[in-house]
Amino acid sequence: MLVLVTYDVNTETPAGRRRLRRIAKTCQNYGQRVQFSVFECNVDPAQWVKLRSKLLNEMDPKLDSLRFYFLGSNWQGRVEHEGAKEPRDLEGTLIL
């Protein structure tokens, strides 16, 4: 299933900047960045549970916010892209 993860982290303190880096790194481990604070994560249910848990453990609920948009398994017909930054194929081969 494709989950769109968005976040807004308060970066006024060093701790906030650390949270931002950790949340971004966690999202990068599960998906691709499509905007500064937006990631597309193509995950199975077990991966989703781990991703959500890691993100919730990193955030400060009094200062930060996370949003999850579930686009499901048939997401290809629900996502359109226009403009700069060619989209990457989430189903394609990833070379590290």
Swiss-Prot record:
User: What are the coiled-coil residue ranges?
Assistant: none
Provide the binding site for Mg(2+): 8
Q: Which family does it belong to?
A: Belongs to the CRISPR-associated endoribonuclease Cas2 protein family.
Q: What is this protein called?
A: CRISPR-associated endoribonuclease Cas2
UniProt-listed NCBIfam families: cas2
Q: Could you state a single Gene Ontology molecular function term?
A: RNA endonuclease activity
Q: State how it assembles.
A: Homodimer, forms a heterotetramer with a Cas1 homodimer.
Enzyme class (EC, first level): hydrolase
